[in-house]
Amino acid sequence: MEKLCKGDKIALIAPSAQIGGISKIQKGLDFLQSLGFEPVFAPHLYNVHRYMAGTDKERAEDVNWAFSQPEIKAVFCVRAAAGAARILPYIDYELVKQNPKPLIGFCDNAALMLALNKKSDTISWNGFLPTYDFREDTLNPLVESSLRQLISNMPQKIISGSTLRVGKTEGTFLCSNLSVLMKLAGTPYFPDLRGKILLIEDVHERLHKIDLMLQQLKQQPYFKELQGIIFGHFTDCSGDEEDGTLDDCFADFLYETDFPCIKDFEFGHTPARYVLPLGANAKFDADKTCLEIISY
């Protein structure tokens, strides 16, 4: 993928929840302009339909519009929260495939990222979201530095986390919020797990729900052909005493599997996180807790 350059036009879309006005994205907008980009607002960016930024078809139209415009070099989601999975039947996946460009977002936006990767073989950047990352006055240095790496098409070699099971592997890298991922189960948009290295995280979930979602993941087609699992941060996830611990959930999930695995990788709903290319080719060394992005 070609690196982005100063002067490039970028689309701003809201495929999930409503924005709530220009003030909510102004700091993020200023940051993107400081990088030299020229933001272009999607036609329905400020629309409102219930909790979402317009109807399903309106939000899908904005995605299709962004990928259809040759002058647009990247597509930035401005908010997540909920709703992206609803637009997936209305995306023109062949259009996206013929006009590849990075989609950048986080959290609920991963539903769209996973669908585009599955249906259009595209690469998205997961981990940056203007409304989320500029709740404070400044962007976290790790988010900013890793985003700049992707913008410049620089290689990523990350040491993070702790080992749960040793091993080395290569595969296609995917990353998602666990709840968002499992909402796609049983749909045409759930990823083909064969040959994949999967990073998952979550926030504000009860431990018994984390446990059940992990077991649901374990029952998906081709799970046994997964190459590796990386657990990111599970922020503010708690439970009752009988629920056990998060490590108990991980241990039950890993039972009767043999792929390499690490936990506490710097990705999730915390101020500091890496921005990572979903769909890239990667090497994973659990012995050294190293994720190396080979190409994207």
Predicted regions and their residues:
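Short acidic/histidine-rich motifs immediately flanking catalytic phosphotransfer sites
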Residues: 69-74, 225-226
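N-terminal glycine-rich "phosphate-gripper" loop used for MgATP/nucleotide binding
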Residues: 74-85
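Short, acidic/small-residue loops that bind anionic groups at enzyme active sites
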Residues: 91-115, 123-129, 257-261
